[in-house]
């Protein structure tokens, strides 16, 4: 009888520690570039854990938020995990409203597709919309909190400007990603970007309301590019 009780105590201890260590099939990275490249190679996406704590605590809290082991394994099959903690070099570039925050990034174009804001220990697994998106069950971008922080859509939904986690702006146009850089002009009410591969400029109102315009470099004639949705 004592043997059975002792065995059950050991078994119970084993289950309680199940999520204190990362499962073998979960990849945790500390470098954005490494995580993106690995995700692209493995045909996965990137889940980014951002928080005002050390890496080990963020990982522990994240894993402990899943009482169902099947869910975390499903998420891990679709994702490479990047941990950005208080010691990470790009942490101070992120305006974090709540800690921790989780971002889901499409590795194909480095676009932030969804965000979970709030304490991880409040159980991420119960945010069904976020989990369904991460696991590929739904494609709606309505999950994204404060979407305007990361993406500017035009009335033509196939064309949009978006911001990567590193702070770079890009333009998705005609099925292609175009890299943009900020361009200094006299248009104080607009953010003006230059396409690094073409001599084109794009002017987006800082209010993010109204129209987007484009012009050829060296030509002050601005033409309508699209209406902000």
Swiss-Prot record:
<protein>
    <recommendedName>
        <fullName>Uncharacterized protein BB_0066</fullName>
    </recommendedName>
</protein>
<dbReference type="InterPro" id="IPR036249">
    <property type="entry name" value="Thioredoxin-like_sf"/>
</dbReference>
């Amino acid at each position: 009888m004592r043997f059975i009780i002792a065995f059950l105590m050991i078994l119970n201890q084993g289950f309680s520690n199940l999520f204190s260590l990362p499962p073998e099939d979960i990849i945790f990275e500390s470098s954005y570039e490494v995580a993106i490249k690995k995700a692209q190679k493995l045909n996965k996406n990137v889940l980014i854990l951002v928080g005002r704590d050390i890496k080990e605590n963020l990982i522990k809290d994240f894993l402990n938020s899943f009482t169902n082991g099947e869910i975390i394994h499903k998420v891990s099959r679709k994702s490479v995990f990047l941990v950005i903690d208080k010691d990470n070099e790009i942490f101070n570039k992120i305006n974090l409203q709540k800690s921790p925050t989780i971002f889901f990034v499409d590795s194909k174009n480095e676009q932030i597709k969804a965000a979970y804001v709030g304490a991880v220990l409040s159980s991420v697994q119960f945010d069904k919309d976020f989990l369904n998106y991460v696991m590929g069950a739904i494609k709606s971008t309505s999950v994204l909190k404060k979407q305007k922080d990361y993406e500017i859509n035009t009335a033509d939904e196939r064309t949009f400007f978006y911001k990567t986690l590193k702070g770079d702006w890009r333009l998705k146009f005609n099925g292609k990603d175009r890299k943009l850089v900020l361009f200094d002009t006299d248009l104080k009410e607009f953010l003006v970007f230059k396409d690094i591969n073409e001599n084109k400029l794009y002017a987006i109102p800082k209010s993010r309301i109204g129209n987007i315009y484009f012009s050829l470099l060296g030509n002050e004639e601005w033409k309508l590019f699209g209406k902000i949705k």
